[in-house]
Amino acid sequence: HLLVGLLYNIEYIAKSKGQAELSPLTHQNDIFQRLISLVNTYSKTERNVSFYANKLCLTPRYLNTVIRQTSQQTVMDWINQSIILEAKVLLKHSNRLVYQISDELNFPNPSFFSKFFKRMTGMTPQEYQKN
C-alpha cells in the first residue's frame, strides 16, 4: 500500500534526524510502529486519539506522550498526515471529483474537506489537483 510506504519513510526521516538516542527505547518505538500501522488501517474512518489509545491498551495522554517523545509530533498530527497523504494520492491519481474524495475519506461534507486540506497544505484540493 502506497500510504504505508510513505508513512514508514516519514518515520525513517524522523528517526534519522538526530534521534539515535531513542534506540534503547524499544517499547516506545514499538508503540510508535503499532500506532502507524493502526493509522494506516483506520485513519479514513477513525480520527479520534482515544480510538487508537484503546486499540493499544493505553490512555490517550500516555499515547500522545510516547508518540511526541518518539517523533516530535502528536497522534493527531500522524492521523492528519495520513489523511492528507491519502487525499493527495486520490486527487493526483484518480478521476474522482473532490466531493467523491471527501465522501471516501469520511468528511461530513466537501466544504469541510476543502478547509481541512487547505489548512494542512496551503492550497485547495482543486489547486493541488491542477498542479
Regions found by a protein language model. Give the residues of each.
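Short hydrophobic/aromatic patch on the recognition helix
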Residues: 63-64, 112-113, 117
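Short, residue-level hotspots on alpha-helical faces of the histone-fold
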Residues: 1-9, 81-85
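Long amphipathic alpha-helical coiled-coil segments
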Residues: 54, 58-64
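Core residues of bacterial helix-turn-helix
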Residues: 56, 105-106, 117
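…primarily DNA-binding HTH/wHTH and HhH modules…
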Residues: 115-131
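Short, Lys/Arg-enriched, Trp-marked, Pro/Gly-tolerant hinge/linker segments that flank
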Residues: 11-37, 41-51, 55, 69-77, ...
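Alpha-helical residues within helix-turn-helix
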Residues: 50-51, 62, 100
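Terminal helix-turn-helix DNA-binding modules in bacterial transcription factors
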Residues: 69-111, 130-131
